[in-house]
């Protein structure tokens, strides 16, 4: 009973009419299958004419296909191999051909790959001695260990975000230490002179205001006309070319209305 439970299921198929069990066991031994005595191969001949194998899905642990023609196994047969094999099971396609085999190897590798098998390997089987036929090469591939429709969680990539170092041991620069004594001193505001705080020039004026007022008196202008010049015609500040004959600002340089009239130091002095 225990030996039957441990017995592994192997399917051997061929496009030939006959396939001896001894040949199947010899090939499986050379392919590296362990405990060969526990194998009880199921043999199907003339498999190229079968549309579907009479086996349940995922019921076979290994498939051995022995082909004597270039068309076997077809894409449809390779799809059947994938259906009946358990996840992680292997398929081995052995060719009985002579002559150039490179193109046929590529064709079989493509077929098993399109059927969903992984890691196809090319095997040299010329060393296997059989009484009924001689092998030239083989292709071995593996069915994925996961089932179609199964899902698994993908690990999300870890994103390295910028990290701010808040180590209190780091020495910080005191902003006040960057200032000199001169920077810390309060600026001294200029002291207003006597003329700036009064409407008229002081008695001992040295800032030049007394001279300006004196020139204004000579022109017959009042202090208000000097400090805040106005014009009813709007042309008094443009210069003598635009002033009328009775303009009080006649003889003065151009100025802006509403701003203090500034007289030069040599104003009203005779030219030499």
From Swiss-Prot:
Domain notes per entry: The C-terminal domain binds 2 Fe-S clusters but is otherwise mostly in an intrinsically disordered conformation. The N-terminal domain has structural similarity with S-adenosyl-L-methionine-dependent methyltransferases, but does not bind S-adenosyl-L-methionine. It is required for correct assembly of the 2 Fe-S clusters.
Record organism: Arabidopsis thaliana
GO molecular function term, any single one: 4 iron, 4 sulfur cluster binding
Complexes and interactors: Monomer. Interacts with ATR3.
Biological role: Component of the cytosolic iron-sulfur (Fe-S) protein assembly (CIA) machinery. Required for the maturation of extramitochondrial Fe-S proteins. Part of an electron transfer chain functioning in an early step of cytosolic Fe-S biogenesis, facilitating the de novo assembly of a [4Fe-4S] cluster on the cytosolic Fe-S scaffold complex. Electrons are transferred from NADPH via FAD- and FMN-containing diflavin oxidoreductase TAH18/ATR3.
Locus of motif Cx2C motif 2: 244-247
Sequence motif Cx2C motif 1, location on chain: 233-236
Keywords, ordered alphabetically: 2Fe-2S, 4Fe-4S, Cytoplasm, Iron, Iron-sulfur, Metal-binding, Mitochondrion
Residue sites binding [4Fe-4S] cluster per the record: 233, 236, 244, 247
Protein name: Anamorsin homolog
Annotated segments matching region Linker: 157-185
Localization per record: Cytoplasm; Mitochondrion intermembrane space
Spans annotated as Fe-S binding site B: 233-247
């Amino acid at each position: 009973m225990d030996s039957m439970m441990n017995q592994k299921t192997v399917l051997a198929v061929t496009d030939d009419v006959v396939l001896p069990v001894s040949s199947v066991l010899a090939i499986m031994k050379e392919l590296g299958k362990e405990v060969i005595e526990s194998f009880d191969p199921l043999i199907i001949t003339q498999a190229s004419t079968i549309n579907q194998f009479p086996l349940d899905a995922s019921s076979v642990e290994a498939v051995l296909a022995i082909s004597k023609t270039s068309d076997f196994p077809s894409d449809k047969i390779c799809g059947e191999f994938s259906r009946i094999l358990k996840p992680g099971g292997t398929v081995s396609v052995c060719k009985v051909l002579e002559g150039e085999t490179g193109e046929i190897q590529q064709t079989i590798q493509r077929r098993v790959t399109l059927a969903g098998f992984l890691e196809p390997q090319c095997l040299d089987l010329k060393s296997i001695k059989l009484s009924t036929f001689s092998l030239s090469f083989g292709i071995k591939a593996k069915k994925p260990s996961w089932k179609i429709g199964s899902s698994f969680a993908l690990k999300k990539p870890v994103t390295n975000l910028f990290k701010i170092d808040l180590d209190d041991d780091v020495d910080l620069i005191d902003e006040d230490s960057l200032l000199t004594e001169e920077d810390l001193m309060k600026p001294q505001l200029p002291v207003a002179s006597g003329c700036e705080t009064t409407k008229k020039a002081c008695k001992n004026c040295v800032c030049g205001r007394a001279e300006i007022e004196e020139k204004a008196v000579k022109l017959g202008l009042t202090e208000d006309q000097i400090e805040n010049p106005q014009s009813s015609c709007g042309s008094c500040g443009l210069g003598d070319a635009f002033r009328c004959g009775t303009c009080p600002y006649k003889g003065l340089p151009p100025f802006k209305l509403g701003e203090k009239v500034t007289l030069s130091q040599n104003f009203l002095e005779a030219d030499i």
